[in-house]
């Protein structure tokens, strides 16, 4: 199914041509009448096929992919397709993403400008901020999260006198499926940004940077808000600011620069990935993702090369040897790799860290290192995560008319730990075995929106105990997938937890939380527009043609439990029940 839009989009009151066309490619139509299900090609496979075709026609292009692993995979698939056709351009395709060294990124940027490289599969890292334009085409693999991002990506194609082509390929997730059915949302007005300026984890680094320019005075509350006094007091207590008669100054004796504390991309420091054979830093990964992607024993892909993670050096917890639990016959062959084809710390310590440190502590600890070795292996790894949520306070409450559903919003502590991983074998990701990990627990103080159900609600819906966990889990996934339609965010900016009986609420509960320290305002926007949020989620799930759940409705690519258990029908029942019992509809 191919849906095309031609014409113009609005930007700053003026019409801007969208190049030749903007296209959204949907997967094959419904299969309900077929005895044999149709296997849908993934958006990444579609993108690789299309990129190879563009390159063979002489085009230069960027393919925007949602994840680092996705960028590597699409680049490898494009090279494979061109190699199979005997194309000389197979070696002129690369990947570009965060985690590459600066010299690698600069070389790739220059190569795509000059035409030495014909195509790059990239994350949003090439979306803006770099002088790369005048390409022939762009491919956007999956909705990029906002109309702003989409227009930035489209703007990379075309130049004076030579219009370009931009293609949007819908991914298998609830939001993309919804947008294909409602294309008017794609070409609407640019969204308003959502940010919580009172969040001390956001405000404190900016106050520190401002104090390095001119002293902070009480009158600056006009600019920084009522939270300024408390934030300044904490910065002084933690040794970042010094009090002088003229105001509060940055402590110039500190080793770091104040600007180092402010990360506009929201990361919290990087883990260096080091080749054990040479001592060379081959890349970096943010602290929040490190445990899930470069744990001891993980298989890590970098520029089409395969690496085996030997260790992840953490100051808090020693790690087990990478080979622990690996079948001896399956240990990877080291050398000659080719291009192309902890135990948790005490609860008291975590709570103390969460409550007393404004500058994210991960910025101070820049010494984590993942040691890797290059290998040739058909093995891949997939980690699993355990999550728990502690309710710290309640700031907003909505009780529905019959009292069977209660919605809340407020601060929570979300604790996660990577617990184990599956060892898989290509090409079909055949399961070999599960291996336990001993990594530390990380606690994120953030904001959540959650709802609870009474026994009367479960009885009214006819949801029994056997189906409850799958119902809540599927509903959580679907609501996370659709929230970006209501709040300016990405599903990767969110997290969630569903439980049949939560310790703090004493009831079946679904939590959706911001994946940012102190919160980002996304789930508050969801709370305030919960009725619209639930309505869109219900439509996305109920209109999906699958029988028992798929990535387009209730499965999640970031699920730490392997998308088990899930009940699509239970989610439809629960969402329909929530629709008239959600806030934001008055």
Summary of predicted features, one role per range:
Residues 556:
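Cys/His-rich metal-chelating microdomains
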Residues 559-560:
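Short, non-ligating residues that shape and space the ligands of small metal-coordination modules
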